[in-house]
């Protein structure tokens, strides 16, 4: 009986372990193959790596340089290198992102000439089409007329022609006939009505205003007199000293 109990317990533990292992695999690799393929899609990764804190011998000794390049040629035969001696960095350019990812995973923090090799992905070069979509687009031109002052005319707007100015040609003709000191007949007289004649005369109001308000003359400002102390000092300087010791002022 004890043997049967132990056997059933071991079977339950094995089933529990297998179920836990299956759940972990599903969590890691996804429930189906599509999720796994989506996780393994490396098209968004860059094709270049940066090796930082590279040993100085790589930049100076040809043998060390060839040994360093041999680490990455295993993953891609078309790999190229760009050395930056002042920064102690090397840019490694692969032909595909898969090779760059494999090199980053397998060679990161590995020992090379007594130093740990630090590998980092280079910045992804975004195309112009993708870059334009990542920014906020301006509003449609249909609603731009709401901005004050308007950046563009509203939809359906048409420029209207200015109306022709109204000119009273009769008035212009009458004004052109007027002359200085001449009379002008507005309405001709008839047997029952008198004629209306306009006589141009000088204005009397202008003469009256000149008499009432004569032009003011600007008086010149008088020069102020100097104070008494300055006058006394000037008189003292006018005095002369004679040879005999007497002073004449």
Swiss-Prot record:
One of its GO terms (cellular component) is cytoplasm. Coiled coil: none annotated. It comes from the Eukaryota. SUPFAM superfamilies: RNA-binding domain, RBD. Residues 8-19 have a biased composition (Low complexity). Inhibits calcineurin-dependent transcriptional responses by binding to the catalytic domain of calcineurin A. Could play a role during central nervous system development. This is Calcipressin-3. It comes from Gallus gallus (Chicken). The gene is RCAN3.
